[in-house]
Structures are given as structure tokens and as C-alpha cells.
Amino acid sequence: MLATRVFNLIGRRAISTSVCVRAHGSXVKSEDYALPVYVDRRDYPLPDVAHVKNLSASQKAXKEKEKASWSSLSMDEKVELYRLKFNESFAEMNRST
């Protein structure tokens, strides 16, 4: 009877200690919902932020060309500028899966 109590106590401590050790290193990172986020939704057509946040050198050059006349831009450059702001077009969003 005494041995059963001792093993019971040791077993409980071992379990609770191992649970504490496992839970100690895990940090849960919560998302800050105060900051605007990008969403692709038909009912929310203009998101608060652009799809691409960190621009490459070629993307920055295209953004500089955007400040000039749009008639001087090719169709591919216009599509590239669109893709910087949006991930999907309305046609792509409306496409059935």
C-alpha cells in the first residue's frame, strides 16, 4: 500500500514535470490585427495594403515608370504593376474551383 502511494506520487510528479518542460519553450506568436492585411475577396475589392510588400529592383523601376505617362507603358508592364497591388483579378476570383 505504501509502495503504491509512493509510485503514485512519483508518477504524478514525473508527468507534471515533463509537461512543464515541454510547454516551457513554446512561444505562441499572435498576429497583430490592428495592422492592415492583404485580402483577395470579391466583396472587398480594394485591400488596404499592396500584395507585394518588399519590391525588387526591377519592380521598383516599374513603379518609377508608373509615375510617367501610362500610354508609354506596354501591356506587360501594366500587368506587372497590377500584380504588385493585387494577387488575383476579378475574373480569377470568380473562376469556379
UniProtKB/Swiss-Prot annotation:
The organism's place on the tree of life at top rank: Eukaryota
Residues annotated as transmembrane: none
UniProt keyword terms in alphabetical order: Acetylation, Membrane, Mitochondrion, Mitochondrion inner membrane, Phosphoprotein, Transit peptide
Bilayer topology annotation: Single-pass membrane protein
PTM annotation (N6-acetyllysine): residues: 29, 53, 60, 67
Transit peptide: 1-22
SUPFAM superfamilies xref list: Mitochondrial cytochrome c oxidase subunit IV
Reported function: Component of the cytochrome c oxidase, the last enzyme in the mitochondrial electron transport chain which drives oxidative phosphorylation. The respiratory chain contains 3 multisubunit complexes succinate dehydrogenase (complex II, CII), ubiquinol-cytochrome c oxidoreductase (cytochrome b-c1 complex, complex III, CIII) and cytochrome c oxidase (complex IV, CIV), that cooperate to transfer electrons derived from NADH and succinate to molecular oxygen, creating an electrochemical gradient over the inner membrane that drives transmembrane transport and the ATP synthase.
Record-stated family: Belongs to the cytochrome c oxidase IV family.
Protein name as it appears in the record: Cytochrome c oxidase subunit 4 isoform 1, mitochondrial
Organism, as annotated: Sus scrofa
